[in-house]
Regions:
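Active-site-proximal or metal-binding-adjacent scaffold patches in catalytic folds
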Residues: 1-138, 147-244
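Walker B catalytic acidic pair
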Residues: 143
Length: 244
């Protein structure tokens, strides 16, 4: 079976419509249908993004899905750039580093990358959709630690933990806390899905190479643990890939 571009949206990442939402400690993103508009538009402020689509728009077509994806990706990049600029330089100033240049790019293989010779950190914009602020701050501290240690030996993890905890005494920390947070943030399946949705060409590569046997689009409720138990706070679009 060949690749059918007209069924791209349905086959690979489901239909993104008003059921799609991101509600985290750093970002609230919602999609609404609106009668008095003829094309999609966005209203934003830092930490909040509302996307409006015409009431009669057919969201199952390739053209409309790609148009929505392009707008949302641009808006997510704006949010990420501003959030990371603020938080990165706040932490960098605390540890005595000069102003760090911040950029964002949709590289699906990485959440962030330190270019220490350029005094720059590049972040994947979808990482601002982590459910908790501590994962974003961990990522910042991880990349800032690379200004001191370029690879990942034990002293790198100790440095990252020192930055994350704000400690001055080198005898006051180990790497246990930071390694635990690193393991937690890597389990955020939602971020992987969003990055693939932002760059579906990677899924097409899986399909064209014959690795994918079946695809099932899913609209999945997103829950968060509270003092009252699990509470549904939104949905995310995902997919299930079964390999040969």
């Amino acid at each position: 079976m060949g690749f059918d571009p007209e069924k791209w949206a349905l086959s690979f990442y489901g239909v993104v419509d008003e059921r799609f939402a991101v509600e985290t400690e750093l970002l609230n993103l919602h999609i609404y249908r609106k009668e008095e508009i003829k094309t999609i538009k966005a209203e934003r402020r830092l930490g909040k993004l509302d996307v409006f689509i015409p009431k009669d728009w057919d969201m199952e077509t390739y053209h409309n899905q790609e148009k929505l994806r392009k707008l949302m990706l641009a808006e997510i990049k704006w949010q990420a750039l501003n959030i990371y600029q603020q938080r990165t330089n706040l932490i960098a100033k605390r540890i005595g580093l000069p102003n760090i240049k911040v950029s964002v790019s949709t590289r699906a293989a990485a959440n962030g990358r330190c270019f220490y010779l350029e005094n720059r950190i590049d972040y994947n914009p979808w990482t601002i959709c982590y459910p908790k602020i501590k994962y974003v701050d961990y990522l910042i501290c991880h990349e800032l630690a690379h200004f001191y240690v370029h690879n990942h030996p034990e002293r790198f993890w100790c440095k990252a933990e020192q930055i994350y905890l704000g400690l001055d005494n080198s005898d006051s920390y180990t790497s246990e806390i930071i390694r635990k947070i690193d393991a937690e943030h890597r389990l955020s399946y939602t971020i992987f899905l969003l990055k693939c949705w932002g760059r579906p060409v990677y899924l097409k590569d899986f399909f064209d190479s014959g690795l994918v046997r079946d695809k099932t689009p899913l609209i999945t409720p997103y829950y968060e643990d509270t003092s009252e138990g699990k509470v549904q706070i939104g949905y995310y679009t995902s997919f299930e890939i079964r390999f040969r």
